[in-house]
């Protein structure tokens, strides 16, 4: 049954468009509808619940934050025209646009309800409020002062005060958790607010058929322009909820989806050749877009497990295992050249602070690995204990390849396949001595990866329970450093420290992969894998 949340006369042609397949349908020719699929569904349109990528993309269509990222991951104004930072780095003052209004909704007592600084205060306090249980509360927790951290100086001036300097805060304010909502809507809809978005974004919700599709239409009063032209260019968006990724791709090849993002590993060879390019039957029919993705796949070692039964308690053994991994081979044979071998640290290609000349990771070198095991007196053990590597089914083949390489030098790696939710639980509880994991940047800053090794952080993010006083000192120093060049130098020094201690084994850096219909223009991929449709056009 179709659940209509909002209704205007525009809804009927939009719904007809989704149903009609006739190429002669005049409405279909007229309306510019971008169609994509969310195989995992959308659970909420509330910004403070924007944890899953599907929710993040949806919130990005419906709401705005004070700042935003362009496709190069540079911070740009959004609801805030500009901002200033006090000399001590504690006070951020944002000057808001005065031409932004929320979409029309019955929750408001006035028409054309304008954005005010008090909306920002409410939204940020709500994000921190335990009553709302936002998974994004960490953004402000422990960073802003306890009493009145957010202040509306007047309707267009908002201030945020920190406990101590924290330069990454601007990048964090680009996260969808921090997008602005009106208090009237939250109060009016209560627990149903997740299904009644009232935002300032380029699109607005018209209908949501749970388990089937969601329909968005353009916000006619959206404030952003491009070269004097009002945004967005699209008339609407249709988001379908097909659970099977292979079926999703078939819908794309049938012309029923405007684009698809990524492919299941089992299906890659049916679409891409060994060089990561479209197979002959797809070349020319579709656009293939790639760019670095701020995601690192790695093997983690539990540094707290120092029992003699765990060979990984010895740093030399951990380093030896790092030299056993043929990262180039993994990318070539298991990934069809999608992604990049992690020959540096955890900070991936795509971040400005990534520098392969200053941070050298591990190459494939079995001879060096053997020498390290000799130094560790590993071969003198009568019955060396095996290393148990926990992973899920999706990474089984890569894990077995690592085990096979390790076996060549007498390191015994036993691969255990367990359910993803159990693996996460064991990682958090410190029950997995060796585990396959991944880390995605929450915001485009090197600190988003280095926080994995700060001893004051529990798991997550510090799943390896790494503790190093020298690293901690540099980490804390970097949080106070406003000069980017100096901050990056601190990042590089930190990377060298943990690489030497080897609490992790970086395997590869991920890559954004998008398959796009030829009539779509203006869809820029980005390293955060954020879907921004306000500048997209359909030819």
Task: Give the ranges of each region predicted by the language model.
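Alpha-helical secondary-structure segments
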Residues: 116-123, 155-157, 201-202, 231-236, ...
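Detector for C-terminal structural segments
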Residues: 209, 213, 289, 294-297, ...
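Structural transition elements
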Residues: 203, 308, 341-376, 395-397
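Surface-exposed binding/hinge segments that line
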Residues: 119, 132-183, 209
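A structural "hinge/loop" feature
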Residues: 40-59, 79-80, 106-110, 168-178, ...
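N-terminal lobe/hinge region of extracytoplasmic solute-binding protein
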Residues: 37-87, 125, 132, 198
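Aromatic-rich, solvent-exposed beta-strand/loop patch
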Residues: 103, 161-179, 194-247, 272-296, ...
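Aromatic- and charge-enriched surface segment that lines or borders ligand/interaction sites
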Residues: 82-133, 159, 248-253, 311-312
């Amino acid at each position: 049954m179709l659940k209509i949340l909002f209704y205007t006369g525009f809804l009927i042609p939009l719904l007809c468009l989704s149903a009609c397949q006739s190429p002669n349908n005049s409405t279909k020719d007229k309306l510019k509808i971008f169609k994509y699929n969310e195989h995992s569904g959308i659970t909420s349109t509330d910004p403070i619940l924007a944890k899953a990528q599907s929710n993040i993309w949806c919130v990005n269509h419906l709401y705005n934050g004070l700042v935003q990222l362009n496709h190069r991951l540079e911070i740009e104004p959004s609801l805030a025209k500009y901002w200033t930072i006090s000399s001590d780095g504690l006070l951020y003052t944002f000057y808001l646009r005065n031409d932004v209004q929320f979409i029309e909704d019955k929750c408001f007592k006035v028409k054309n309800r304008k954005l005010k600084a008090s909306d920002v205060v409410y939204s940020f306090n709500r994000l921190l409020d335990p009553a709302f249980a936002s998974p994004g509360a960490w953004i402000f927790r422990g960073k802003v002062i306890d009493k009145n951290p957010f202040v509306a100086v007047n309707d267009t001036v908002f201030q945020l005060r920190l406990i101590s300097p924290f330069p990454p805060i601007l990048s964090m304010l680009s996260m969808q958790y921090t997008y602005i909502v009106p208090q009237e809507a939250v109060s009016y809809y209560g627990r149903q607010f997740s299904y009644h978005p009232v935002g300032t974004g380029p699109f607005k919700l018209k209908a949501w058929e749970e388990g089937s599709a969601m329909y968005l239409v353009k916000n006619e009063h959206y404030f952003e322009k491009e070269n004097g032209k009002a945004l967005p260019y699209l008339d609407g968006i249709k988001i379908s909820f097909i659970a099977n990724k292979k079926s999703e791709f078939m819908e794309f090849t049938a012309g029923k989806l405007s684009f698809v993002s990524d492919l299941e590993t089992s299906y890659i060879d049916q679409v891409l050749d060994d060089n990561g390019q479209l197979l002959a039957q797809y070349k020319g029919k579709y656009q293939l877009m790639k760019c670095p993705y701020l995601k690192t796949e790695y093997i983690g070692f539990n540094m707290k497990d120092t029992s003699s039964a765990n060979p990984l308690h010895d740093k030399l053994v951990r380093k030896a295992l790092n030299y056993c991994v043929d990262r180039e081979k993994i990318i070539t044979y298991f990934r069809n050249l999608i992604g990049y071998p992690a020959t540096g640290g955890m900070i991936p290609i795509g971040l400005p602070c990534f520098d392969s000349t200053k941070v050298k990771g591990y190459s494939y070198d079995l001879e060096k690995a053997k020498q390290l095991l000799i130094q560790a007196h590993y071969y003198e053990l009568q019955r060396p204990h095996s290393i148990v590597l926990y992973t899920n089914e999706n990474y089984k083949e890569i894990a077995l390849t690592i085990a096979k390489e390790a076996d060549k030098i007498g390191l015994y790696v036993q691969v255990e396949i367990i359910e993803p939710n159990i693996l996460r639980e064991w990682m958090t509880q410190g029950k997995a001595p060796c585990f396959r994991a991944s880390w995605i940047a929450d915001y485009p800053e090197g600190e988003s990866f280095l926080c994995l090794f700060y001893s004051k952080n529990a798991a997550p993010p510090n799943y390896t329970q790494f503790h190093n006083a020298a690293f901690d000192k540099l980490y804390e120093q970097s949080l106070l450093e406003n000069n980017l060049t100096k901050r990056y130098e601190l990042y590089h020094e930190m990377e060298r420290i943990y690489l030497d201690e080897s609490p992790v084994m970086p395997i590869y850096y991920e890559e954004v992969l998008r398959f796009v219909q030829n009539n779509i223009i203006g869809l820029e991929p980005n390293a955060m894998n954020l879907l921004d449709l306000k500048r997209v056009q359909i030819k």
